[in-house]
Amino acid sequence: SIFCCPSCQKPLCREERRLVCPAGHSFDVARSGYVNLLLSQQTGRKHHGDDKRMVKTRSAFLERGYYDPMRQELIKQGLAAARQGMTVLDAGCGEGYYTAEMAKTLREREYRPKVAGIDISKAALQEAAKRDRETEYAVASCFHLPVAGESVDLLLSVFAPYCGEEFL
């Protein structure tokens, strides 16, 4: 996994249907394919991000192609920076519209990337995981990225909250 433990910041390793760190913290992978790495004290709220209706509405809009030119430009920029085995993180990935297409393109061109997406919305990540089963998805905040420093080669953050300190 490219993710780190949100409690101790140690690397997480996949063990069947969960991610585990050396300190013994364990995070179950949901049946739909994402893992929840958002600690309750990081937001102070019970419900996070977009609900199912909002995700469904946005997905329907995006599938009409209005943002395809932008998505294609992002992919073009990503390919310009591409290298073998690169790590890609989409911070605020939503339903995976940009993430899945970037991952698909890099895989088709045999870059063998490690791709992950985070979002604060479980509903959005359920859709993202359906769209792309090979990408790792986690419920997490852009303000507390669950990745090691300097471990990401390409960072996407499209229409998501910006946290400059986390993106350095």
Which ranges hold each PLM region?
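Glycine-rich helix-loop-beta junction characteristic of Rossmann-like nucleotide cofactor-binding loops
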Residues: 75-83, 108, 145-146
